Amino acid sequence: MISNAKIARINELAAKAKAGVITEEEKAEQQKLRQEYLKGFRSSMKNTLKSVKIIDPEGNDVTPEKLKREQRNNKLH
């Protein structure tokens, strides 16, 4: 996961961009940091979804087959 310092830098650069005083070098840094943040977020979300089991109101497991296969491959359920 991305460090708190990098998140603070992302926010700092966003504030500068909003104020209209960001340089091209800072824009490139901002884009790189945002991509790093999104990569970590997507990875975390994917891992969370891999551990989900969907149950309908009658109590039946209605987890999609694709997700069940992923869970079996990763031995989560």
UniProtKB/Swiss-Prot annotation:
It comes from Bacillus subtilis (strain 168). The gene is ynzC. Disulfide bonds: none annotated. Residues 63-77 have a biased composition (Basic and acidic residues). It is found in: Cytoplasm. Induction: Repressed by LexA. Belongs to the UPF0291 family. GO terms for cellular component: cytoplasm. Keywords: Cytoplasm. This is UPF0291 protein YnzC. Residues 56-77 are annotated as: Disordered. It comes from the Bacteria. The keyword Cytoplasm applies.
